[in-house]
């Protein structure tokens, strides 16, 4: 054996050992081969053969060897040269296994005929050993018996495994043997027929009907299957067309044949259509015929829903649909069309993002099919003519001929986007291709495709073009140019409105004393020119923005753009001309003034008329009726482009009035604030400044002096104008928060917010549950009589109990409660003989003992009853004990004993009735009775033994003695002593000697419950103690009282899928990951044990370990696996998500199981998970698909993620995994890559079993990864709805019970249109980890609850935000899917689903009676990356056509709602920061120009009201107060007022204002940079547990350009203002005006270190400094990353500046840094009063000298290696000369020391400005050879900035209390729960097991 083979064999053996030892933990991988390479996987026999070999290798290694050899020969035949990826390794490994088996075999040559005989003999032996003939019959008998036990499950698994092995053995025999004995051949065929259910299927076994799957027995499924069968009108299929023997041909087989669809795609869509039809039928009625038939109504509804978009498309293009008359089409034809559409959609791959393209394809294929339908025999369609005329099983004719040409051009364009770096205008995205089909021009493409059309023209790759500009076909109808002008282009109505209102308010403010004069009237009339000029600006932008799309855009659309341009151009010129002439007119009666008024009136009237006609909902019908008039149609077309999307986006009148009133209130507040506090106070100062003609300027002024001091006025008004633009968002936030609070209160949110409330209201829960979550019952009456109410309460409790108990059990399984707490919380079945309701023990515990004390202390019966009835649960406890004890005793005792008990109870009843209880019984001795009864019950609850029987008799006799001697009074005692029968039995010793031991389960449960009631002494007021368990129970019980749609039965509910995209995140923590320590000595497991100590103890108890056990004590595989799951369920892992989502299936099984049972049995949930009918019903209604994009590659690379995913499939039988399989196979001597979309499930051997494999036209990832991942797998989803779930989300069993209620919202009235997206509330479960996590959690919670509540209603503008919303699945899959995928522009892919829905006349709602868990980022760096990603995504949204169309086509008030809750929020955030800059640069101008001092001297600005108002508004926005307002109101609503105040104050102590200010900078930087330069990309933020210390250099790299540089600029401005613009009397004024700016700067500089764990520990700080200096001075190079070298990082930071426009913008923005030098040099004492420009010129000479000195001292050591001494001499001499020059200047000239510092202050920003401009023009500087000098300068600046930040951190680290405070501040929540964060951070791990 060669060395390579030997090494490979060792690797294989190691892998085999790992697989065997990790069997439980990692899934049952085959021990012969773990993975068959994808290039061989198309032959599925290999995998099956190797599995069979694995199965039998222990029984007969020789047979296993034969199978392995056959598998090897198949692999060799498929790929003889081993060219496929992984094939060589696979074959080598398999050969080594074969050689091992041969080595163990007896010596001799291999006789193939002998092997065949052995194989035949083994087949017979294997059948006999496993009792094959009786195996299936035994399972059938077990199943029919209804005994759903583990035995049944075991039998089923065994049968499947045996028959799967037999099938492989028979198949191999048939392939190896030339002849097989006839008898054996018959047996093999018979066994193969019995192995039918080993054939892979998804939900319904349509191609292989099986007896073990109950879905096929449902009448609605049978009806749906029957409806698809071949009908008489269909041409006959060729006789050789393969149809499975287990079913007859259907219409999908017909379509498969004529169009060449793929076999698996047809099978997939067959099941899809069957389920759609069956579920629709079940909602109408259940067919009861012998041969069930579908109702026409069900077919019609599915047909219209699925083809609604196609019908609208035909209507839009004014073409006849594929049918002439819809009503004339019969059901069979509708199903044929429906099947064709879904087959097209199912195989369309990336073309699914082009819904109207699919309409085009469907339109032509239907017409082509109609031609074929006229024939007798089916023939392949010309457009999809397969190579094999019979229609191959795996034919891909449709894929090759229809989809591939489209995919080819789409992929070519996508490749040309240069991985997202190319401008959007340079390539066609998905929307461009789709919108081509919005015009009749698309029909020029013909059918079959005319591939010579320019539409199919592929661009020349950019890399092959020297200029870098690719020739390409133009964009379609919209071009995403990268510019801020899109904000005006899309929302021009808002900006026009704000500008005109500002102008009007200013005119009123300046003329407030003379509002009725002609002058004022003419000024107000200036609004006319303002309007038309701004409209003209918008039309100019339309012309500019369409550049790049003119050649391909419809001529009509282009004509409209230029008509509008001409119209508004002429209107603006004409109206402006008239206005100017009116100003010169002598009086108001002048003809020109009158003409102007008439023109304005007409123009305004027409504008107003069409606004009403097209924007007001009630006028839409009128507008549509007016379309027959050409003039009206023309004006409507001119005013609003008629796109396919965006039509009819109006709401009903009542909804319109609601959001209109909301915005009127907001706008009234906003403009009142603007007028009284912003504009009006500036009127006087403005007039005075304008009048000042002799203001001395201290510098050389160019602009302001001779122009009414224009720049001074601008510096005064600029911050006010900035705040004017953004404060509307402030008022929106405040009013929406209060409205959301009121709406939440109306919806009854937060009514149950404590355990006390649960206790108090528990008796109302059963009734509320029956009303809200249970289907109506016939035996539940509405009669209100006392007896009927009691009966109804009993029925309600009985039906509520199984659901409540399952909730409690799930809490225990999740380790949130202890076993004892579970016992207290569980509710009795309430279905027994007791007529009263039995409540859970946690309500009744200790109540009996308290009642005993009350009875002993009270003096009368009335007092006893009055005191007991004060507490309802005490009353219930007493009643239950009283009646239950009687039942137990009478059932246990016989003869005289039973008579005695009955007599006692009769006497008690008589005494109570006569109110003589105190006279007849000595209640002060009740404790004696309770003691004896408790002793008796303690014995009876055990199993019967002779000793227990004696003990019970003794206890009864003691009880008898106590009753006779102690309890009964003298009078009552006499009655019993004279009772001869009893006395005789007692005297003879017969009394109580015969006992009937309680063996009945119900009676035994009563005994145990009674015992608990007597023995539990502690109050259960704090049960459960776990905060998460409390929260969940509180929310669930609260939701029972909310407005929930009444549910339908599971059978009639809407079906749905859950869909989770996954890439490579953590699936399940391994033990290595859990126990690995970080640099602080902390492991994940140790962290979790400290964070969740109670849950850790509960876990140990659940697996049967002592609570002090260490993880090292868990030595068996089962416990280790449970530990891995326990830890994973507390992280943000796929395992947690899968567990949560599979609760849907569990809930549906429970609901279905109980609904199917009748009478009292309907309350017994025992065995519901084993019921085949319940499982089948749940599978029909629920599907869970996780789309693991690279699962195939992970399997191939044997990644642990693949093993863990397989394990999840084993544990969750309904879980389906979809993935993209990349198959590298040789073709014509070259490696050819093919892509398949595959769906797998777990099989009986624990491996994944392929269900469907659908070939794709190419690599599916053409755009953004996540939506492409979703798109390829969406074909495997099922149902009417689909819930999008991220892999960091969770779900809860109690919430899953409400899913069918939520789905009923689709049929509820939510406006003029039915809902298409149902919004779902989220709970952020990571909020308790740290203060940062709580900030994010609270911020997120306020948005997903209060914020979205208002957006949905009344604003009617809620979108989809990537949260767990439920989509109308059919609506969305026929309209482009649940997300958009174009590269970069759709980086925030989820929100575009909401945009698309709204544009396509959908409706998005929000519902808060159900919630889903969600994890959030918990570290500052994670949060910053996440917020940067979202801000960048919003920057891209600004450029998108969706935002443009929504901004243009929504009515004005919905448009404002849309703007301020999407991109407007980020614009206002950016304006908040810009306001600081505007204010400070304005103050710097006043200070440096000298104007500020003059103004102060002349007391012009005595009133700072406007500026103060502006700065206060900015500061409040800055520190997050308007994030906090919704948060606080949400707290008040759901936690109560006091707790809300405590939470808010706590947040302030935790420095939440610093965090929100810091976040402001993050959003501003990424939003602005994305619009300017692009560069938005998906950020993998990481979802781990963050308690580790972040290094200084890492923080510096992340925040240097986004925060630190900007903070330094703010500080420079503040210092300049302090130095030159402030006098001694103005100190208070300076502080008041600049406090927000100082706070912002300090927050931006030091927040990363304040929120850095151990950020102020001295040792860490020292290590950080060393690491930072190493990074700073380490030179970069090829392959060096930014984390390793400053140079590499610096180059990365400049990579986003790529375009000429970007370089110009950066240059313009950088010019601001030169203001410092220009202003400061004129303030130097050296220049005196000279204000000539020469002073500024000499300052540049000085700066040049400094640069020369810098170059001298940074001269390259490599270059100077030969003249080091000379260089040192020159450097020393230069330094001495510089110092001497400064000293001489200070001594001999007016230059002062302060002037030197002033020069430093001036030159630092100048240097940075030069550096910024140089970076923008990097290619030019490189060609000039100056780049190294620039890099040296940049390093110096970063070094200085780093030191300025580092010094305060180091200083604080000297004081230990700072570190203590920081730890307390960061982890306060953890401390409040008794956590040991200080121990965690110190790394003092006491756990020896780690």
UniProtKB/Swiss-Prot annotation:
It holds the Pfam family FKS1_dom1. The keyword Membrane applies. Residues 511-523, 582-591, 680-722, 1479-1512, 1561-1609, 1652-1703, 1754-1768, 1817-1838 are extracellular. It catalyses: [(1->3)-beta-D-glucosyl](n) + UDP-alpha-D-glucose = [(1->3)-beta-D-glucosyl](n+1) + UDP + H(+). GO terms for cellular component: 1,3-beta-D-glucan synthase complex; cytosol; Golgi apparatus; plasma membrane. Its EC number is 2.4.1.34. One of its GO terms (biological process) is pollen germination. It is a multi-pass membrane protein. Disruption phenotype: Plants develop deformed or collapsed and inviable pollen grains. Keywords: Cell membrane, Cell shape, Cell wall biogenesis/degradation, Glycosyltransferase, Membrane, Transferase, Transmembrane, Transmembrane helix. Belongs to the glycosyltransferase 48 family. Involved in sporophytic and gametophytic development. Required for normal plant development. During pollen formation, required for the entry of microspores into mitosis and microspore symmetric division. May be required for correct temporal and spatial control of callose deposition during pollen mitosis. During plant growth and development, callose is found as a transitory component of the cell plate in dividing cells, is a major component of pollen mother cell walls and pollen tubes, and is found as a structural component of plasmodesmatal canals. PANTHER family: CALLOSE SYNTHASE 9, LYST-INTERACTING PROTEIN LIP5 DOPAMINE RESPONSIVE PROTEIN DRG-1. This is Callose synthase 9. It comes from Arabidopsis thaliana. The gene is CALS9.
